[in-house]
């Protein structure tokens, strides 16, 4: 079965122009621009024999009926929301690839025994609410309305208000939960977002497991004082306390090993002026790994360092846990299917873990799940310089297409 690469490229480019900020790609979840992107895909699908549905959290389902439509669906997908000042491939690649496969099946009148379901998950990125993979977590029953009620964006807007602004009802969120018996399996195609495939000269990454993050906010209260009149030994500098903790987090991740990584992605200091000792500081902390004990050791060390820094500098420090996801090991049969498919199509491949989190990690709690990577040039992602060669995109779609059709059984 062929692939219309021009259509794929055109759709990815069109999505890249839907942004809330001129001259860059920023499309956060539950915004007017996010809805515009979803509606563009919906309008295209209306031209084909596909059923279209959005659930109460905003996940989009595009379904092609199977010959035995009562059977569980072979599902696949990704997301289309972005980080701030994003690249154009993270998320849209897997979503558009899945859409292209459905459109080709419709155009070529190919029927499968099992139904096919493309899922475009809402709010995969943590950029708006500091809470990642929101749509898949709700759909898979990992979080519910009560857990989400405390989420706020940087403007202080709650998730319920953000949803209402785009016509969704937060009180219906729990209705989005799906049952495991509805799915035969799930696949996600994604850019690697790291340099390994390019460095190794491989076209396809066969993912064995997905690292999961611990995310937390550290809130540090000190004493705002005059920068000239307050002697150094009288200060309770919240920013310096935050700086100490940031460096401690870095050291802990290095010591933990097992490819554990930790990031302080943002430091906010208040009042944020030159002539005042900072009286308040806030850190956004992201700790990831596939090795649970190693990852958790970084968080434990952070807690220990908080006690030390608090006492040393006379600070009040609160550690607020936002989320703690579990790393996922993907089923061997799904890994083998993807590897064998890549080999059969003549593509070189690398067996590898995913350092980034993905919606696939939550789908893996519902059904057998596989994940396919293609190279990211220089390993760059979450950046306008993010790039993947179109020939690699074509290869990834062909591998995805073949594993889907094997699972769905062409009639």
Curated annotation (Swiss-Prot):
EC number of the protein: 3.-.-.-
Protein name per the record: Uncharacterized hydrolase HI_0588
InterPro entries, per database record: Amidase_Cbmase, ArgE/DapE_CS, Bact_exopeptidase_dim_dom, Peptidase_M20, Peptidase_M20_dimer
Keywords: Hydrolase
Enzyme class (EC, first level): hydrolase
MF (Gene Ontology): hydrolase activity, acting on carbon-nitrogen (but not peptide) bonds, in linear amidines
Family stated for the protein in its record: Belongs to the peptidase M20 family.
Record Pfam families: M20_dimer, Peptidase_M20
Bridged cysteine pairs (disulfide): none
Superkingdom of source: Bacteria
């Amino acid at each position: 079965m062929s692939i219309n690469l021009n259509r794929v490229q055109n759709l990815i480019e069109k999505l890249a122009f839907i942004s809330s900020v001129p001259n860059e790609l920023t499309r956060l979840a539950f915004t007017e621009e996010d809805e515009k992107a979803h509606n563009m895909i919906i309008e295209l699908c209306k031209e084909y024999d596909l059923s279209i549905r959005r659930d109460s959290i905003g996940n989009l389902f595009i379904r092609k009926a199977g010959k035995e439509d009562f059977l569980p669906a072979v599902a696949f997908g990704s997301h289309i929301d972005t980080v701030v000042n994003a690249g154009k491939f993270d998320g849209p690649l897997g979503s558009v690839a899945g859409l292209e496969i459905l459109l080709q099946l419709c155009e070529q009148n190919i029927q499968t025994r099992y139904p096919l379901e493309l899922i475009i998950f809402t709010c995969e990125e943590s950029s708006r609410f500091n809470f990642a993979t929101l749509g898949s977590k709700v759909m898979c029953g990992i979080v519910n309305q009560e857990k989400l009620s405390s989420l706020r964006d940087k403007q202080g807007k709650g998730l319920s208000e953000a949803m209402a602004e785009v016509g969704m009802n937060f009180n219906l969120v729990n209705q989005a939960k799906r049952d495991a018996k509805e799915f035969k399996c799930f696949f996600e195609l994604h850019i690697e977002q790291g340099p390994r495939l390019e460095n190794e000269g491989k076209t396809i990454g066969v993912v064995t497991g997905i690292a999961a993050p611990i995310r937390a906010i550290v809130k540090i209260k000190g004493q705002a004082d005059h920068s000239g009149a307050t002697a150094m030994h009288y200060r309770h500098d919240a920013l310096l306390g935050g700086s100490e903790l940031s460096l401690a987090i870095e050291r802990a991740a290095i010591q933990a090993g097992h490819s554990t990584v930790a990031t302080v992605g943002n430091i906010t200091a208040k009042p944020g002026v030159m002539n005042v000792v900072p009286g308040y500081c806030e850190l956004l902390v992201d700790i990831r790994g596939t090795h649970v004990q190693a990852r958790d050791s970084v968080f434990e060390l952070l807690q220990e360092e908080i006690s030390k820094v608090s006492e040393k500098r006379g600070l009040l420090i609160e550690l607020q846990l936002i989320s703690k996801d579990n790393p996922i090991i993907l089923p061997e049969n799904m890994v083998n299917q993807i590897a064998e498919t890549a080999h059969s199509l003549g593509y070189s491949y690398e067996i590898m873990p995913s350092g980034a989190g993905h919606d696939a990690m939550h789908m893996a709690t519902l059904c057998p799940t596989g994940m396919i990577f293609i190279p990211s040039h220089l390993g760059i992602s979450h950046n306008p310089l993010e790039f993947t060669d179109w020939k690699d995109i074509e290869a990834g779609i062909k591998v995805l297409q073949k594993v889907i059709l094997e699972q769905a059984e062409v009639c």
